[in-house]
UniProtKB/Swiss-Prot annotation:
The gene is glpK. ADP binds at T11, R15, T264, G307, G412, N416. Pfam families: FGGY_C, FGGY_N. One of its GO terms (cellular component) is cytosol. Belongs to the FGGY kinase family. Inhibited by fructose 1,6-bisphosphate (FBP). This is Glycerol kinase. Keywords: ATP-binding, Glycerol metabolism, Kinase, Nucleotide-binding, Transferase. It catalyses: glycerol + ATP = sn-glycerol 3-phosphate + ADP + H(+). Sn-glycerol 3-phosphate binds at T11, R81, E82, Y133, D242. PANTHER family: GLYCEROL KINASE (PTHR10196:SF69), SUGAR KINASE (PTHR10196). It comes from Albidiferax ferrireducens (strain ATCC BAA-621 / DSM 15236 / T118) (Rhodoferax ferrireducens). Pathway: Polyol metabolism; glycerol degradation via glycerol kinase pathway; sn-glycerol 3-phosphate from glycerol: step 1/1.
Length: 496
């Protein structure tokens, strides 16, 4: 039997999953990760806790699977993107907590970069917006605020990495300092056309090149896990940021194929092949997971509050005792009764980009109940995702392609049948849930398997992907369009 081990290091937890060569889950293990909030708008993780929890789950999952490390053909890594770690090359000790992707402390740097007129340069070279979301400004903050850090960086004594680089360094006992193109593309320092760090961007942010990891394709040999950690030297064969890994795990290998991950937020990616397409509709362009040195691209849109709206129903409104009960409450009414919830708790992301927006509930009447609000909250996830897909379809058509024909879904909230059916109704296309919804970890396993000969090609991997259920639209297109108009009207009311 052939086994692949995926390390899935996320924002809220570290997970490890063992897959067989057919892409089926054999065993999994998970440990929560402590969230650190030093002040409003700041979010940190302890890099040593990231490593401890990830190693512990890797050991645990091998035991659960009843296998030894020598039976594992390859290891893949997928990770929360943009989160920034800086450590000593000599001791391996972090010089500061990891600054998490949600952290906004670097916004003043972004204001300065925009004022200097760098937005067009950043967008042309990286596909990204100038935003504190991305790693480059977080790295600059560490260099500017940790005593002695900038001088140590100039001397080549420090290493920077996103979470994948940090894990690779630990797994190889500091012998490998590397990242893949998908993670590099989230730093605002990486030229997605040349697949290299960009000197002009490094100068703009005053970041020494000596800090940076080597860049490899997502499917490549990054080194071997030190035998003392898991019991054998396992090749590290795949590395990708979580959303690009999910795109790969969904077997979205051809231009125009789209996946949406329904997690705390929602992340929609459309593969655009070897074509770099700038969005005219509020999306960003990013590197897709690459199996060769040739660049591959994806368009991406991010919804800040997806499944988190269900947590708000539970913890804020106390409408439900547990998240799993939201579907039953929402199904207790035939529709939302004209109620619209726009969960702009932290502003609105793509395609609106309204940082000043705040959450609203509109359309309330004396007949409105908690069930109507719960249904409207659940439907808000589908409305936001529909706005993303419509933006992607417009971009695709403007670039000479076709409108999106099918949406592949994954993430925790995709198990909610009511939500998936409403999503299909709004979009007017099939929404397809795969048999294996652990697609983020599966993508890392597939990438590792490709690099080590378990799979011959992405065509072979495509044959392994299986649908569990297809949700077909059951709503008249005119009614779906009317609902989207109501949604857009509600969105306009979120900014005072």
């Amino acid at each position: 039997m052939t086994y692949l081990l995926a390390l899935d290091q996320g924002t809220s937890s570290s997970r490890s999953i063992v897959f067989n060569a057919q892409g089926q889950v054999v065993a999994q293990a998970q440990q929560e990760l402590t969230q650190i909030y030093p002040q409003p708008g700041w979010v940190e993780h302890d890099p040593l806790e990231i490593w401890r929890t990830q190693l512990a789950t890797a050991r645990e999952v091998l035991a659960k699977a009843g296998i030894e490390a020598r039976e594992v053909r390859a290891l893949g890594i997928t990770n929360q993107r943009e989160t920034t770690v800086v450590w000593s090359r000599k001791t391996g000790a972090p010089i500061h907590n990891a600054i998490v992707w949600q952290d906004r402390r670097a916004e003043p740097t972004c204001v300065e970069l925009r004022a200097r007129g760098l937005t067009p340069t950043v967008q042309a070279k990286t596909g990204l917006l100038v935003d504190a979301y991305f790693s480059g400004t977080k790295l600059k903050w560490i260099l500017d605020h940790v005593p002695g850090a900038r001088q140590q960086a100039e001397n080549g004594e420090l290493a920077f990495g996103t979470v994948d680089s940090w894990l690779i360094w630990q797994l190889t006992h500091g012998t490998v300092h590397a990242t893949d193109v998908s993670n590099a593309s989230r730093t605002m320092l990486f030229n997605v056309h040349s697949n290299q760090w960009d000197d002009e961007l490094l100068r703009a942010l005053d970041i020494p090149a000596k800090l940076l990891p080597a860049i490899k394709p997502s499917s490549a040999l990054f080194g071997e896990v030190s035998p003392d950690l898991l019991g054998a030297a396992i090749p590290i064969g795949g590395v990708a940021g979580d959303q690009q890994s999910a795109l790969f795990g969904q077997a979205c290998f051809k231009p125009g194929m789209v996946k949406n991950t329904y997690g705390t937020g929602c992340f929609m990616l459309m593969h655009t092949g070897h074509s770099f397409q700038s969005s005219a509709n509020g999306l960003i362009t990013t590197s897709a997971a690459q199996t060769t040195a040739q660049p591959e691209f994806a368009m991406e849109g991010s919804v800040f509050v997806g499944g988190a709206v269900v947590q708000w129903l539970r913890d804020g409104l106390r409408a439900i005792p547990s998240s799993s009960e939201v579907q039953a409450l929402a199904e207790s009414v035939p529709d939302a009764g004209g109620v619209m919830v726009v969960p702009a708790f932290t502003g609105l992301g793509a395609p609106y980009w309204k940082p000043d927006a705040r959450g609203t509930i509109t359309g309330l009447s004396r007949g409105s109940t908690l069930a109507h609000i719960a249904r409207a909250a659940l439907e808000s996830i589908a409305f936001q995702s529909a706005a993303l897909l419509q933006a992607m379809s417009r971009d695709a058509v403007q670039a000479g392609g076709s409108a999106v024909a099918e949406l592949r879904v994954d993430g925790g909230a995709c198990v909610n049948d009511l939500l998936m059916q409403f999503q299909a109704d709004l979009l007017g296309i099939a929404v397809v849930r795969p048999a294996v919804i652990e697609t983020t970890a599966l993508g890392a396993a597939y990438l590792a398997g490709l690099a080590t000969g378990v799979y011959r090609s992405t065509d072979e991997i495509s044959t392994l992907w299986q649908a569990e259920r297809r949700f077909l639209p059951a709503l008249a297109p005119a009614r779906a369009a009317e609902l989207m108009e109501h949604w857009e009207h509600a969105v306009r009311q979120t900014v005072l």
